[in-house]
């Protein structure tokens, strides 16, 4: 339950390290961490999941202070690159799930509103990724064409 006069909403969550320096307890070299990242990616884990696995199972709080490179940069260097960035992909999957729900329940107006909100986030992210160069300029969000991602 949330505390009355705090803004945290009562959700538990892990705290990012305040000073991103290499902790003294880490026994892994930068090359070993890089190999762990590549191995986990080849086993099919997305970048966010790799970070969680490294934190929980290997005791590595952050990859960048140890290796000097971001996790996604390591994956790109080893030829493991996602066509669509992970956050955008997750939003697209959510929108496809809501669309499927609306096919069965067309009068569910709350879900229709939720779909509008999710799709506006998708359009904003697409604009950003086109500007930054992570998506090609001709990329267009088309739910029917991207329905193969729902699985």
Curated annotation (Swiss-Prot):
Q: GO terms for molecular function, please? A: small ribosomal subunit rRNA binding; structural constituent of ribosome
Q: What is the protein name for this chain?
A: Small ribosomal subunit protein uS15
Annotated Basic residues bias: 1-16
Per the record, the domain of life is: Archaea
Quaternary structure, from the entry: Part of the 30S ribosomal subunit.
Q: Which Pfam families match?
A: Ribosomal_S13_N, Ribosomal_S15
Q: Which CDD domains match?
A: Ribosomal_S15p_S13e
* Alphabetized UniProt keyword annotations: Ribonucleoprotein, Ribosomal protein
Name the encoding gene, please: rps15
For region Disordered, the annotated ranges are 1-21
Q: Belongs to which family?
A: Belongs to the universal ribosomal protein uS15 family.
Q: List, alphabetically, the NCBIfam families matched.
A: PRK08561.1
What GO biological process, any one, is recorded here? translation
Cellular component annotations (GO), alphabetically ordered: cytosolic small ribosomal subunit
InterPro entries (UniProt xref): Ribosomal_uS15 (IPR000589), Ribosomal_uS15_arc_euk (IPR023029), Ribosomal_uS15_N (IPR012606), uS15_NS1_RNA-bd_sf (IPR009068)
PANTHER family with a match to the protein in the record = RIBOSOMAL PROTEIN S15P/S13E, SMALL RIBOSOMAL SUBUNIT PROTEIN US15
Database matches in Gene3D superfamilies: 4.10.860.130, S15/NS1, RNA-binding
Ribosomal protein listed as a keyword: yes
């Amino acid at each position: 339950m949330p505390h009355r006069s705090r803004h945290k909403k009562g959700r538990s969550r892990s705290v990012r390290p305040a000073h991103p320096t290499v902790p003294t307890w880490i026994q892994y070299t930068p090359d070993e961490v890089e190999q762990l990242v590549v191995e986990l990616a080849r086993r099919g884990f997305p970048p966010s999941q790799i970070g969680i696995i490294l934190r929980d199972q290997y005791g590595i709080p952050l990859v960048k202070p140890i290796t000097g490179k971001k996790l996604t940069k390591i994956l790109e260097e080893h030829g493991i690159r996602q066509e669509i960035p992970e956050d955008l992909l997750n939003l697209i999957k959510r929108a496809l799930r809501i669309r499927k729900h609306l096919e069965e329940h067309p009068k569910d107006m709350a879900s229709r509103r939720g779909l509008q909100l999710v799709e506006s986030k998708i359009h904003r992210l697409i604009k950003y990724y086109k500007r930054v160069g992570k998506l090609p300029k001709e990329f267009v969000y088309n739910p029917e064409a991207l329905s193969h991602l729902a699985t």
